[in-house]
UniProtKB/Swiss-Prot annotation:
GO terms for biological process: mitotic recombination. It comes from Saccharomyces cerevisiae (strain ATCC 204508 / S288c) (Baker's yeast). The keyword Transmembrane helix applies. InterPro entries: N-acetyltrans/Recomb-assoc (IPR052564). Disruption phenotype: Displays increased levels of spontaneous RAD52 foci in proliferating diploid cells. This is Putative increased recombination centers protein 11. Partially overlaps YOR012W. Disruption phenotypes caused by deletion of this gene may also be a result of a defect in its overlapping gene. Coiled coil: none annotated. GO terms for cellular component: membrane.
Amino acid sequence: MTWMVKLLRQMISMQSQYGAALGATCLLHYLTTSLSIRFFFHDLTVRKHEVMPLGMDYYYLYAIGKDPSHPEIRGSVRKILEKYKTKADKANCALALEAISEHARSVYEYFGFKTYLVFQFGVGEVNSKGEPDPQGKGFTAYLMLYHKDADTIFHA
């Protein structure tokens, strides 16, 4: 089983067992023990700091998701994003996240996020749908940032 499949299974398991907050914390631990640590916690951080002004604080929104077995529950992503956008606007700080699909990217764009890095994820482990494939090309992911004054203070 590849690390990506393990990661996705771990995320579903932890979120259904313990709720999203603890699930995300457990996922963070799992992710830091995988081979992707350099990319997620170094390369993406470097790009965030290239875009944002030196010393700018930011909230990192990690593992936002929805349980597909409950399509009747709507608006949870909106509540999370609106709450953190309000906090960030008041504190004059940014929001950062990674979108792992075109759909997620379009949702975040609707809420004012912009893409600052496009990258391939899971190459040689999964196909474009995230299914295990040792010859897989992985899938495209996006580093996205939000700030109320992004157009004037962020460096593209």
